[in-house]
């Protein structure tokens, strides 16, 4: 803890700058699309699905655009997300979200409050109907999520609530299991 595992090189610095630029441009584009589709166009189910599709496709492009990061999808269970469900995943890096949400447009993520309020992508999170659960699952949130499941959306939960500094698996909060019931 406290020491870099990799030295900073010009190559790493350029890759980081490029990746962050792609991220910022993608955030601006998705925020604009969300505003046009869901604020001006109205929050119809059709527009919500369109926005989720743009989000999913943007993540697919971003994953391919990040230099030095390979993405290989191994769908050994042949999951096609034709039925909604609860997706429980551990959370090791910022890339986890992109890799998970690129799988299907009908995925809604439970998030922390700081992500909900993030200046870079908070609007995208709100347009996509991702829900903050930092304070736990209240009845209002559970009802919103039930409605999303009835509309065919799967719910993505990182039950640890945050990423660990050393990539170890942290304590699982009970909300994921409560929601699954």
Question: Predicted regions: what is each one?
Answer:
Residues 1-6:
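Short, Lys/Arg-enriched N-terminal segments with co-localized hydrophobic residues
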Residues 7-72, 123:
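A transmembrane-helix-recognition feature enriched in membrane-embedded lipid enzymes
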Residues 70-181:
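Soluble catalytic domains of membrane acyltransferases
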């Amino acid at each position: 803890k406290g020491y870099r595992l990799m030295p900073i090189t010009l190559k790493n610095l350029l890759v980081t700058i490029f990746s962050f630029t792609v991220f910022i441009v993608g955030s601006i584009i998705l925020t604009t699309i969300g505003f046009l589709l869901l604020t001006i166009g109205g929050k119809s189910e059709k527009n919500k699905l369109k926005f989720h599709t743009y989000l999913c496709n943007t993540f697919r492009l971003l994953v391919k655009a990040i230099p030095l990061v390979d993405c290989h999808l191994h769908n050994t269970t042949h999951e096609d997300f034709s039925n909604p469900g609860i997706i429980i995943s551990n959370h090791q890096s910022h890339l986890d979200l992109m890799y998970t949400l690129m799988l299907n447009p009908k995925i809604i993520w439970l998030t922390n409050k700081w992500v909900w309020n993030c200046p870079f992508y908070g609007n995208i999170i709100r347009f996509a109907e991702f829900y903050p659960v930092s304070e736990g699952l209240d009845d209002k949130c559970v009802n919103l999520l039930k409605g999303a499941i009835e509309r065919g959306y799967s719910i993505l939960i990182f039950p640890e609530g945050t990423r660990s500094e050393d990539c170890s698996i942290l304590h699982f909060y009970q909300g994921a299991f409560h929601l699954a019931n």
